[in-house]
């Protein structure tokens, strides 16, 4: 399919040396991480115990960052051939989620992490809050690729695009001799969360497991219509809880061109060999169906609640790691 990319929403040190290599050989083109993923890896995998003991004299956040950066560097190296050959192959790392309402601290942390990792195929994950749009702009302006995350509303996706695109324009303006300098243009993804909508609104909806798909389709249409190939829609939160849906449901239903889907391992396994293009619905079709399923006020409230909950969950996961270390 034209410009569709499937990423793995998981990272763990030993996994990167084994199963991850198999996934790359079967068409996986990137990976994502978040505080919850690192929490599960660091606290549950024995491979980190010796490393933690060797770092015990350091501050807890420094220990976390050293572990996380090591894994991100390893993933970046595994993905490097895809990055240099196909302009894909990114791995994402999120800034400290507790900084989401502070522009200055978020920007400083993002630049520091990018420098510490020292790999070109890194995307810095920035939550889409009011304080963060300026961060996205500054990073793209300075040639640092961005994963704008925790997007639930059309308004968020539009503001992310505006910030990212403005930074991209400035980057290009400041790098007129781009080819001579051998400088790569930064890329961005706008991560639209999908299944969380359905889990929240299914009890109130007249049709099950459709709101997340329709909402994501709407944001995708907005991003795709801008015709900027360096800024793509990414579908996140595409895992299925329970047995009422196929594990790859949120991959198959959002198989759109020039998009990315980052999925958990069970969804990727279920999806193997099913690359069938899906035609996105047009906006009027989306709104017609959405309005039959649930009210606009319920959708708007859900967007706000899900953003608040997502920020809180990542902050709690981050705090849990630090407490355990």
Swiss-Prot record:
Species: Campylobacter jejuni subsp. jejuni serotype O:2 (strain ATCC 700819 / NCTC 11168)
Lineage: Bacteria, Pseudomonadati, Campylobacterota, Epsilonproteobacteria, Campylobacterales
Keyword hit for Cytoplasm: yes
Protein name per Swiss-Prot or TrEMBL: Transaldolase
Gene Ontology terms: biological process: carbohydrate metabolic process; pentose-phosphate shunt
Pathway: Carbohydrate degradation; pentose phosphate pathway; D-glyceraldehyde 3-phosphate and beta-D-fructose 6-phosphate from D-ribose 5-phosphate and D-xylulose 5-phosphate (non-oxidative stage): step 2/3
Subcellular location field: Cytoplasm
InterPro entries in the record: Aldolase_TIM (IPR013785), TAL/FSA (IPR001585), Transaldolase_2 (IPR004732), Transaldolase_AS (IPR018225)
GO molecular function, one term: transaldolase activity
Annotated catalysed reactions: D-sedoheptulose 7-phosphate + D-glyceraldehyde 3-phosphate = D-erythrose 4-phosphate + beta-D-fructose 6-phosphate
Database matches in Gene3D superfamilies: Aldolase class I
Similarity section: Belongs to the transaldolase family. Type 2 subfamily.
Active site feature: 125 (schiff-base intermediate with substrate)
């Amino acid at each position: 399919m034209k410009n569709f990319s499937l990423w793995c929403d998981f990272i763990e040190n030993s996994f990167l040396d084994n199963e991850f290599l198999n996934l790359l050989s079967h068409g996986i083109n990137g990976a994502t991480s978040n505080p919850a993923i690192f929490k599960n890896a660091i606290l549950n995998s024995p491979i980190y115990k010796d490393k933690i003991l060797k770092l015990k004299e350091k501050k807890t956040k420094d220990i976390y960052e050293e572990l996380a950066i090591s894994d991100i560097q390893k993933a970046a190296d595994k993905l490097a051939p895809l990055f240099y050959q196909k302009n894909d192959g990114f791995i994402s790392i999120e800034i400290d989620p507790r900084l989401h309402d502070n522009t200055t601290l978020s920007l400083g942390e993002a630049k520091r992490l990018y420098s510490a990792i020292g790999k070109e195929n890194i995307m810095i994950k920035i939550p889409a809050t009011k304080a963060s749009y300026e961060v996205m702009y500054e990073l793209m302006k300075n040639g640092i690729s961005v994963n704008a995350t925790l997007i639930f509303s059309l308004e968020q996706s539009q503001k992310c695009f505006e910030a990212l695109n403005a930074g991209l324009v400035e980057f290009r303006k400041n790098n007129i001799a781009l080819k001579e300098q051998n400088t790569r243009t930064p890329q961005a993804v706008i991560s639209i969360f999908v299944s969380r909508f359905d889990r929240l609104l299914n009890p109130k909806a007249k049709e099950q497991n459709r709101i997340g798909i329709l909402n994501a389709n709407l944001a995708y249409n907005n991003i795709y219509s801008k015709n900027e190939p360096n800024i793509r829609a990414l579908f996140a939160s595409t895992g299925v809880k329970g047995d009422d849906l196929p594990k790859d449901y949120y991959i198959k239903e959002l198989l759109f061109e020039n998009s990315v889907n980052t999925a958990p391992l069970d969804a990727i396994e279920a999806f193997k060999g099913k690359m069938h293009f899906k035609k996105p619905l047009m906006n009027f079709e989306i709104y017609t169906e959405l309005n039959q399923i649930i009210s606009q006020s319920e959708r708007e409230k859900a967007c706000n609640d899900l953003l608040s909950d997502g920020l809180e969950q990542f902050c709690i996961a981050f705090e849990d790691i630090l407490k355990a270390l």
